[in-house]
Amino acid sequence: MKYIKLLAGLVLATVLFLFPPSAQAASSSSITRSAGEELTAKDYSGQNLVGYEFTNVVLEKTNFSNADFRGGVFNGSQLEGVNMHGVDFSDGIAYLTQFQDADLTDAIFTNAMMLRSVFNHVDITGADFTDAILDGVEIKKLCAKAAGVNSRTGVDTRESLGCR
């Protein structure tokens, strides 16, 4: 009996070695939207973008106003002059992303992870950053200009950032 188990194990190992099962995991390119593209002046306003990913893209003057972008991802992207007024970016990720001259008014960033992202010359009036994770330097910059209350959540922008 001992030899039969050993022989069965050896046969199984040989079969797996000679005929390995194929990998079924998705590659990152199959789940990324618009990787490496330049998306200047595109209009995504009011659209359902739940779970969309933008990786290494230039989004100049792109309109995301009032879009449902929950769980979305910006990774290594440049958002210059974008309109994100009223966007819902709850549970989203913005990593190594540059927000430059962006309209983030009345946007919802609750539970968003926005580490190593930079916010230069942005308007965050009425934006809700409740439980969002941002770098300390960026929080200080945003607190210097934070004002208003989000029209949908009723949360004060300064309070959501933890400004003193």
Describe every region a protein language model picked out.
Residues 2-8, 13-14, 21-164:
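Tandem repeat scaffolds
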